[in-house]
């Protein structure tokens, strides 16, 4: 297949070509071979200097001032502040330096970024029937993902002009340029290769009419190697394919008292190698095709745990019971029940620490800028006590189908206990690290998963509908980690932050006592009394904060539908999330004054007595009190319920078939990220996208099968 799309910025485009083929051969009565190949080639192109939100001017400013004009009434591109103030630019202009103004729209097409991507996946399966009831499989999978990129910043781009001007010296009225004229070329070459090998033996044997045994045992080895290389050139000339040399060892005086600087090499290299080895067994014994006993076991090892075998290997197992209720004699009269199955499992699973190792990892990063000697940085400190997180699960399930498959359902109730919970824990800052992944405690979780699917017909039409519903609640029952500063728990539940007796991703806030009716100051509570001592309020103990709940939705799911009539069909899906909280953004006056970082809540601020009855946004105060800002920013006024219902996607299609041939196809038009149809908050906010809304994607396409 082939598809072409446009990006989210002007001039951006991408192409993708996909190929997939599957083949099978039977070599005699017992031996067969299957293989699959998948190839994806893609290309992307963007103007890398295209201004994006938020536009950060620099120089301590984190946002562009409101109502900034990028184009005048006659269509001319206008400049905005970028790193330097106007008086500094006037001086540079008087000294004859290059134009140092930043015009975002003029700079848009001065720099380009191109990338070429390829993804190849091969899978081979050698299948051999040892005996009629005993089969063996040897499976090999190879994956290769590579990308090449080229980023070119033109000589007249702001990036290059900025560097040329900064490295310009004025000597006796003459300009000396230490940075070369020309473009900056950056190349990237990334490759990922993985190999997966599996040997598996399966058994399917009946003993008489009442006993059946299904089992498989196997081992799997997986390796993945990631290699990343980047290079670049200064003073690049695309017409003659030349570049200019620069001195990376010299420390230069920058123009206008901007300090000192050195030219950074554009070459970098990195790579990772990971290996995992697994052994597994699955078995099911059935009696009279009604009662079942299952057992599974698995043992995994990973090279991230060094050479200690006991740390590498993590044994996992589960056992289960199965009862086909619909096959019992007392159910024979219930013809409307297709099947009814009860099941239960108990076992242990595991979670490997992602990116955390029990050995010290260092990375060699080149030569030091002053001594020119090679040096290395500690990528992660030693963590010898690190273990897998173990999860014990007890599950009860019910599966059913009624009225010839018109209604199919699955219901699961589970209880989980996590041991050796993995979490980033506050660490001794004198070590150079503020957080370290540790095993910090235990979590108890219980929940319900429900799936219902229906199939109905009406005349020439049909309606297929399914709903997935999940409820999950967790609580930290044991915590051996470090309780950090109060400020660490005020991010609105964006980080894990386990606490005894609380859910994961907890949402805390300062208790608000409303606004002062006299001057609009925010107020809190100190020792049970209304207070405006912001320094004390901002450092209040965690136990006196409001605990709202979790930022992770306890209730979530989706409703998927396909309605067809004749050759036309309509697909749509709704997503829902209930029971969670999030922290909304609001005005922070210090950021407004110092960094031009404003917010629409500025219009809702307290301005006169009586406003405290209709707003929670404090009055503007200058000079600003940073502790006052901090208290309001993290107060309960900015904690909002996150319940929502969203139309995720919708598609209208037409299916066709060419008579007297095997050619079939579809034409369709659809949209993704359609939008919210209900939210619980009154702020008109989308809890999933607090900055920019998710882009709505419109697609038109088709496919043909020969």
Question: Each PLM stretch: what is its role?
Answer:
Residues 105, 158-161, 168-171, 577-666:
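Extracytoplasmic gating/loop element in the C-terminal half of outer-membrane beta-barrel translocons
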Residues 548-585:
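Glycine-rich, aromatic-lined ligand/substrate-binding cores of catalytic
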Residues 293-301, 529-552:
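Catalytic-site beta-strand/loop segments enriched in glycine and acidic/polar residues
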Residues 1-14, 45-54:
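Periplasmic-side early beta-strands and strand-to-turn transitions of outer-membrane beta-barrels
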């Amino acid at each position: 297949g082939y598809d072409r799309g446009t990006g989210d910025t002007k001039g951006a485009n991408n192409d993708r070509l996909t190929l997939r083929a599957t083949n099978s051969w039977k070599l005699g009565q017992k031996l067969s071979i299957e293989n699959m190949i998948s190839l994806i080639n893609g290309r992307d192109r963007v103007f890398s200097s295209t201004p994006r939100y938020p536009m950060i001017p620099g120089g301590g400013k984190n946002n562009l001032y409101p109502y900034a004009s990028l184009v005048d009434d006659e269509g001319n591109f206008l400049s905005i502040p970028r790193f330097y103030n106007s008086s500094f630019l006037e001086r540079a202009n008087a000294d004859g330096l290059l134009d140092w103004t930043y015009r975002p729209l003029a700079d848009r097409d001065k720099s380009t970024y191109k990338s070429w991507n390829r993804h190849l996946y091969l899978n081979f399966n050698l299948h051999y029937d040892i005996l009629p009831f005993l089969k063996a499989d040897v499976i090999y999978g190879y994956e290769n993902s590579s990308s090449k990129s080229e980023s070119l910043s033109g000589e007249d781009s702001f990036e290059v002009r900025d560097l040329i001007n900064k490295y310009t010296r004025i000597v006796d009225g003459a300009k000396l340029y230490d940075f070369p004229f020309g473009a900056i070329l950056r190349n990237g070459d990334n490759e990922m290769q993985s190999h997966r090998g599996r040997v598996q033996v399966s058994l399917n044997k009946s003993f008489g009419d009442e006993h059946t045994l299904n089992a498989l045992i196997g081992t799997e080895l997986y390796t993945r190697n990631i290699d990343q290389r980047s290079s670049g050139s200064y003073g690049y000339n695309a017409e003659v394919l030349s570049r200019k040399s620069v001195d990376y060892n010299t420390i230069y005086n920058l123009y206008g008292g901007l300090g000192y600087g050195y030219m950074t090499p554009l070459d970098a290299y990195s790579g990772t190698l990971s290996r995992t080895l697994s052994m597994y067994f699955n078995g099911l014994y059935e009696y009279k095709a009604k009662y079942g006993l299952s057992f599974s076991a698995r043992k995994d090892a990973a090279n991230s745990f060094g050479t200690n075998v006991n740390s590498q290997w993590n044994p996992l197992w589960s056992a289960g019971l199965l009862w086909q209720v619909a096959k019992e004699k007392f159910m024979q009269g219930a013809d409307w029940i297709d099947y009814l199955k009860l099941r239960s499992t108990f076992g242990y699973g595991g979670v490997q620490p992602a990116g955390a190792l029990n050995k010290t990892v260092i990375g060699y990063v080149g030569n030091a800028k002053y001594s020119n000697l090679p040096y290395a940085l500690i990528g992660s400190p030693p963590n010898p006590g690190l273990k897998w997180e173990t999860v014990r699960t007890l599950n009860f399930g019910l599966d059913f189908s009624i009225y010839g498959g018109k209604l199919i359902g699955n219901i699961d109730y589970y209880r989980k206990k996590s041991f050796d919970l993995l979490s980033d824990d506050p660490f001794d800052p004198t070590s150079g690290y503020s957080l370290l992944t540790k095993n910090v405690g235990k979590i108890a979780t219980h929940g319900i998963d429900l799936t219902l699917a229906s199939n109905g017909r009406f005349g020439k039409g049909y309606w297929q509908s399914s709903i997935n519903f999940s409820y999950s609640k967790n609580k930290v029952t044991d915590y051996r980690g470090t309780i950090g500063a109060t400020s660490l728990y005020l991010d609105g539940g964006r980080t894990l932050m386990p606490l005894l007796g609380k859910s994961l991703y907890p949402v805390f806030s300062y208790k608000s006592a409303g606004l002062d009716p006299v001057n609009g100051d925010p107020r809190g509570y100190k020792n049970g009394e209304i207070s405006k001592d912001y320094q004390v309020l901002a450092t209040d103990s965690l136990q006196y904060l409001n605990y709202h709940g979790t930022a992770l939705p306890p209730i979530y799911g989706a409703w998927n539908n396909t309605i067809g009539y004749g050759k036309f069909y309509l697909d749509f899906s709704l997503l829902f999330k209930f029971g969670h909280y999030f922290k909304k953004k609001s005005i922070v006056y210090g950021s407004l004054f110092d960094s031009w970082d404003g917010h629409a809540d500025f219009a809702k601020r307290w301005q006169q007595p009586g406003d405290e009855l209709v707003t929670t946004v404090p009055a503007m105060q200058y000079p600003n009190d940073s502790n006052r800002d901090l208290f309001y920013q993290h107060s309960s006024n900015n904690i909002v319920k996150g319940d929502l219902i969203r139309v995720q996607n919708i598609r209208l299609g037409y299916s066709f078939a060419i008579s007297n041939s095997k050619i079939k196809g579809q034409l369709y038009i659809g949209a993704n990220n359609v939008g919210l149809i209900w939210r619980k908050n009154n702020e008109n906010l989308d809890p999933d996208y607090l900055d920019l809304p998710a882009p709505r994607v419109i697609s038109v396409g088709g496919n043909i099968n020969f």
